[in-house]
Amino acid sequence: MFRLDELAARLGGDVVGDPATTVRRVATLEQAGEGDLSFLANPKYVGRLKSSHASAIIVADSARSLLGEKAGIVTRDPYLYFARVAQLFNPPEAVAPGVHPLADVAVAVPASVAVAAGASIGAGVELGEDVVIGAGSSIGAGVRIGAGTRLAPRVVIYPGCVIGTNCLIHAGAVIGSDGFGFAREKSGAWVKIPQVGRVVIGDDVEIGANTTIDRGALDDTVIGNGVKIDNQIQIGHNVRIGDYTAIAGCVGIAGSTQIGARCMIGGQAGIIGHLTIADDVVISAGTLVTKSIHKPGVYTANLPVQPHADWVKNFAHLRHLDSLAARIRALEQSPDHPESA
């Protein structure tokens, strides 16, 4: 439980109303009640603010007057402020250090490390202070994991990979499996190319459940600092992702693509291999990227939803674009066309 003036002292912001107002959790404007702290980040929800029963509301300076008699905190970015308050109210679960008797650990680990039942830690592994290894996780030989990193149950880290400090890797993620590398014989048979690179992950990275990041063929696959990767994402071998890029669920990134810093990639986007994407690029959900992107900006290549009957009619026209274009060119070249006179 915090008073508003205590929150402002920790996180900044201007308190409106009674600074001794206490809040015990964060909640949406609709669901908030006595003792709850809510926030208004989007002006279209002003109506919900007016009817909210929250004890206090976080708002931008432009919405200060909307608080009326309600208590609140005024800040430049209400959504970011809400995120920081939510961290205060919901700290990571405390985990007792120690190695479970049913864990298979081949190395000495710091006393502050927690290794759960069924986990396996191979030879030559280096774990930093306060690392947590979840139940059933497998850490291959020679892996290095930085201080404060947490692995949920059943995470697999293949041999030789490097994980930075204060990372969070969710259940079922696989780091360092073989990249998809094969050479083809004249007969059509495939010859596997050994994947001898590593996966190197920076600090403060979060990797979602059931995401797979392939090890490099020769060079490493590299994930920069502060990168946020959602669930069920496939990252191919030799990919390099710049600092603070965020990638939403079900994205596929083919091998040897380089993605810049601070990019945002929407869900189910696909990026083919050997491309370069500049810093500060936003790729809309469902977009297929087939060419390199050299300038910052928002890029979209998909069709918005529409009634099926309309889609069928529009697609019928799409199938005949070549003939329609030829007819237009013929009309433009006709002696009867106004511009040909």
Swiss-Prot record:
The active site is at H237 (proton acceptor). It is an enzyme of class 2 (transferase). One of its GO terms (biological process) is lipid A biosynthetic process. Keywords: Acyltransferase, Lipid A biosynthesis, Lipid biosynthesis, Lipid metabolism, Repeat, Transferase. The keyword Iron-sulfur does not apply. The keyword Acyltransferase applies. One of its GO terms (molecular function) is N-acyltransferase activity. Pathway: Bacterial outer membrane biogenesis; LPS lipid A biosynthesis. It comes from the Bacteria. SUPFAM superfamilies: Trimeric LpxA-like enzymes. It catalyses: a UDP-3-O-[(3R)-3-hydroxyacyl]-alpha-D-glucosamine + a (3R)-hydroxyacyl-[ACP] = a UDP-2-N,3-O-bis[(3R)-3-hydroxyacyl]-alpha-D-glucosamine + holo-[ACP] + H(+). Transmembrane segments: none annotated. One of its GO terms (cellular component) is membrane. Its EC number is 2.3.1.191. It holds the Pfam family Hexapep_2. Signal peptide: none annotated. Disulfide bonds: none annotated. Belongs to the transferase hexapeptide repeat family. LpxD subfamily. Homotrimer. Catalyzes the N-acylation of UDP-3-O-acylglucosamine using 3-hydroxyacyl-ACP as the acyl donor. Is involved in the biosynthesis of lipid A, a phosphorylated glycolipid that anchors the lipopolysaccharide to the outer membrane of the cell. This is UDP-3-O-acylglucosamine N-acyltransferase.
